[in-house]
Swiss-Prot record:
O-Mevalon transferase yanI; part of the gene cluster that mediates the biosynthesis of yanuthone D, a fungal isoprenoid epoxycyclohexenone that acts as an antibiotic against fungi and bacteria. The first step of the pathway is the synthesis of 6-methylsalicylic acid (6-MSA) by the polyketide synthase yanA. 6-MSA is then converted to m-cresol by the decarboxylase yanB. The cytochrome P450 monooxygenase yanC then catalyzes the oxidation of m-cresol to toluquinol. The gene is yanI. GO terms for molecular function: O-acyltransferase activity. Keywords: Glycoprotein, Membrane, Transferase, Transmembrane, Transmembrane helix. Coiled coil: none annotated. GO terms for cellular component: membrane. It is a multi-pass membrane protein. Yanuthone D is an antibiotic against C.albicans, methicillin-resistant S.aureus (MRSA), and vancomycin-resistant Enterococcus. Glycans are attached at N2. This is O-Mevalon transferase yanI. Its EC number is 2.-.-.-. PANTHER family: LONG-CHAIN-ALCOHOL O-FATTY-ACYLTRANSFERASE 3-RELATED, OS04G0481900 PROTEIN.
Length: 448
């Protein structure tokens, strides 16, 4: 009896096995992502074909992949988890393009002058210069100032002075955060004002108009969120580099910071929307896997001038590029389901991006039947433009909401008995609120 009472009075000692110590100090996916990036920057400085280089490369690949199985960062914000998951896959695709399938210091060159064009030879740089060179290589997304500048970067007229450039960038930051605040509070207002299920206080016309407003808010609001993910770093960095003339030489020029998005005026077809209007941040490394696979084809197939061969190459490249983009975004839903302990989900991003590629193929076929050529700017008639705007916007808004936003919101565990459109609206609100540093929200006494 006394032994039993003594046993209950003595607290249980914690298990301090080696495995428990490792688990208690295990790294999160964020740590592995940072380690993989730092190792990628260091690898080009190691001698080629050396044991050191192979060892660093193996360690870098291990860290990049370990990020997908390590515990997600300790947060319950689904928008933050989604963004970090997309970032991990984005960087992995970047490594595939600029590290795994090439020798970076031999393949990628900074442009030191344009008239005539002169390229920097990174193999001749000392280690003190090659490390910053590699940091720039793995940081840039559109290849501005490099020999691999992506196509479709919007043309813009740079301000006449650095002070005007800095002012314009500061105003853009203010407008961006104010827009995010507006998206957040508008979503809050709509979510609070709409009736609960089972009530009928609006006619069909009012319901349709309300739904169209929500579609527009979801699509345009998330477009601003996507923009903010780039601008959050690019805008302050451009102010620092141009305003104070610091950083890489190419970054100190105002022309090195063109807009991320092209003109909506050019988006009168799906091909032009994705090729001209939408951002080019992923264009290089989403197309890299297809280009790598095509490099194994016989020369006769890769260089054939036959129409069937050219069309096959063109559309296979486009389809694979959209699939890779879908996989990158799918990593966000995968990360959310792991971080929140939800059933494993991959969202609907792959289906959505494949649908865009197939739609472009159908659109191209229709234009071919109607003898319409949209490849050149300025040749489309007024009727062609406005019919194109309506068709493109209608398809894009519907497919974006139903095949991308709704599945991602459901995979994030968002629930609303009023239906999936309200779930998508809540996802939009969370995404806008999750963008860090929103001083506009704080200024208006709104918690972001």
């Amino acid at each position: 009896m006394n032994g039993s009472n003594l046993e209950h009075r003595i607290p249980a000692l914690p298990h301090l096995g080696f495995g428990d110590v490792l688990l208690s100090h295990s790294l999160a996916s964020t740590h592995y992502t940072v380690l993989a990036f730092l190792l990628a920057v260091c690898i080009p400085s190691a001698p080629r074909k050396s044991i050191l280089r192979y060892g660093l490369l193996l360690l870098q690949i291990t860290c990049a992949l370990q990020a997908f199985v390590a515990p997600p960062p300790p947060t319950s914000d689904s928008a933050v988890l989604y963004t970090s998951g997309v970032l991990m896959a984005n960087l992995l695709a970047r490594y595939f393009d600029r590290l795994y399938t090439t020798v970076p210091e031999e393949s990628f060159h900074r442009i030191t002058s344009t008239k005539p064009e002169s390229r920097e030879d990174a193999t001749k740089l000392p280690i003190t210069q090659r490390l910053p060179w590699a940091l720039e290589l793995f940081s840039v997304t559109r290849g501005i100032g490099w020999n691999w500048r992506v196509s479709g970067i919007p043309k813009s007229t740079a301000p006449k002075s650095r002070s005007r450039f800095v002012t314009a960038q500061l105003l853009t930051i203010i407008a961006m955060y104010a827009g995010l605040y507006l998206v957040e509070v508008t979503c809050q207002g709509l979510l609070a004002s709409y009736s609960s299920p089972g009530t009928t206080n609006a006619n069909a016309v009012q319901t349709l108009a309300g739904n169209l407003v929500m579609y527009a808010l979801i699509v345009l609001g998330l477009a601003l969120v996507v923009y903010s993910h780039f601008a959050l770093f690019v805008l302050p960095l451009s102010i620092l580099c141009v305003g104070l003339q610091v950083g890489p030489v190419a970054w100190r020029d105002m022309s090195a910071w063109p807009p991320d998005y092209g003109s909506l005026w050019e988006a009168y077809s799906l091909r032009r929307f994705w090729g001209i209007t939408w951002h080019q941040q992923l264009r290089r490394h989403t197309g890299a896997p297809a280009a790598y696979l095509f490099s194994f084809l016989p020369d006769a197939v890769r260089t054939s001038k036959r129409r069937s061969a050219r069309l096959t190459r063109r559309y296979m490249l486009m389809l694979i590029t959209f699939v890779i983009s879908g996989l990158i975004h799918t990593s966000g839903s995968y990360h959310v389901s792991r971080g929140l302990g939800l059933p494993l989900s991959y969202g609907g991003e792959v289906k959505y991006f494949i649908s865009q590629a197939i739609s472009i193929m159908i659109e191209d076929f229709g234009c071919w039947l109607l003898r319409i050529d949209d490849r050149s700017a300025g040749e489309a008639s007024t009727v062609r433009r406005w019919v194109g705007y309506i068709v493109t916007a209608g398809w894009y808004f519907w497919s974006r909401v139903h095949w991308s936003v709704m599945p991602v919101a459901l995979a994030s565990g968002i629930q609303d008995e009023r239906g999936p459109l309200f779930i998508a609206l809540e996802h939009t609100r969370r995404s806008a609120a999750a963008v860090p540093g929103n001083f506009a929200a704080k200024a208006w006494k709104i918690t972001p």
